[in-house]
Design a protein with these regions (language model features):
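Protein-protein interaction and targeting regions used for scaffolding, dimerization, and localization
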Residues: 1-58
Length: 58
């Protein structure tokens, strides 16, 4: 898997996790050119997920 694909997967996985924990305040859906996101996103957790994917973490 190339770097872009790893980062995209990390973003999708983290946003999915945040969606499950948000009690309906965050929604994420596939859109024509990416994702459609509504609600609060924990940007620090998202950044850590991206950094972990680049560094080869889980």
């Amino acid at each position: 898997m190339d770097l872009e694909a790893q980062i995209a997967e990390a973003i999708r996985t983290e946003l999915s996790r945040q969606t499950e924990e948000s009690q309906g305040r965050l929604t994420v859906a596939d859109a024509d050119q990416g994702l459609e996101i509504h609600g609060p996103v924990d940007i620090e957790a998202l950044a850590m997920a991206i950094a972990g994917s680049v560094a080869g973490g889980p």
